[in-house]
Amino acid sequence: MLPALAGPAPSGGEGTVEGIGEALGRSQGGFSTKLHLRAEGGGKPVAAVLTAGERHEQFALDALMDKGAVPRSGRGRPRLRPRRTAGDRGYSSPPARRRLRQRRIEPVIPTRKDQPRQPDFDKAAYRQRNKVERLIGRLKQYRRIATRYEKRATNYLAMVTLGMTMLWLT
């Protein structure tokens, strides 16, 4: 018998870390969940990560970069590491930029008002982030994704993955 399976199974919310395990966070309107997406250059979804609503975006960055491979246009293995990544101001923090540079990924993230400006910010590359925003809009057309009906984060992530698959097929 395995030690982890010995004894009664936890009931209710026992054994789970609230807000992290089920990606439920508190906001003024009640519970909230953030959906972080990674898309390839054409705007197709590659990976998704869920976090609690009040969690900072930088905590999802590593998990998002570890997931998904982008198929190459020609022959060869899929790319696991993008050359650059564009994100909104929520991802703008020195630790997040440092972790992206350690992975040899150029961060194209505008700085927040309380941070010093970047002299080498690429506005043309940042405009490509529009594809991710449109991807989120297309995913939210599915009512089940726009409104989280599922109690469990794994079930909600399964619905998001199903929606991402539908977008790849259309």
What do the predicted segments below correspond to?
Residues R98-R104, K123-T170:
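Basic, amphipathic alpha-helical segments enriched in Lys/Arg and hydrophobic/aromatic residues
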Residues M1-R112, G163-M164:
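Polybasic low-complexity intrinsically disordered regions
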Residues P116-F121:
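Short, charged, surface-exposed secondary-structure boundary motifs
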Residues P78-R79, D122-A124:
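Short hydrophobic "helix-edge" motifs at membrane interfaces and signal-peptide entry regions
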